[in-house]
Amino acid sequence: MIARIAGHQYRKGLHALERGDLDALLAQFSPDATLTFVGDTPLGADLSSATDVRAWFERFLRLLPDRRFEVQRYQVSGPPWKMQLAAHVVIRSSIDGEPYENQFAHFLTLRWGKVVDDLILEDTQRWAGACERLAAAGLVDASAAPMR
């Protein structure tokens, strides 16, 4: 039962991100949550403050304004005070009018329903190519340094 609730909350967070509702999304995060996006791209990050985590999601929204997520599978384990959620997700968007699709592995640690650690492993080669296209289209954030 707890796994189903966690899966529902996870999808609810992704839907908030699709809508660009960062307040709803970040309400699921603990104030001391960490976020790691592996890679040396504009979304690359190793963050540990609520302000920086919000700034990362703001950059994400600017880079992919019409994003859609499709959860392929997820697994939940552990008690409510140290729950682990792992998901395989496909992301779709468009870049300069052309379709963009990628996939990522998402690992969350939750404490009493709040995200305390967020780790994202995306196909960085595909994402780096997308950033080149975005930069060529004039999006400044697409050539920004990782957020460390």
Which stretches of residues belong to each language-model region?
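Short glycine/serine/threonine-biased micro-segments
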Residues: E18, F37, I95
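Short, low-complexity N-terminal intrinsically disordered segments enriched in polar/charged residues
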Residues: M1-A27, P31, A137-R148
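A solvent-exposed, acidic/Ser-Thr-rich amphipathic alpha-helical stretch
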Residues: D23-L26, S30-W81
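Short N-terminal micro-motifs specific to bacterial/archaeal maturation
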Residues: A16, L43-G44, D118
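A beta-strand edge to alpha-helix "cap/lid" segment located at domain peripheries
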Residues: M1, I5, E58-R148
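Secondary-structure boundary/capping motif
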Residues: K12, F29-S30, A50, R54, ...
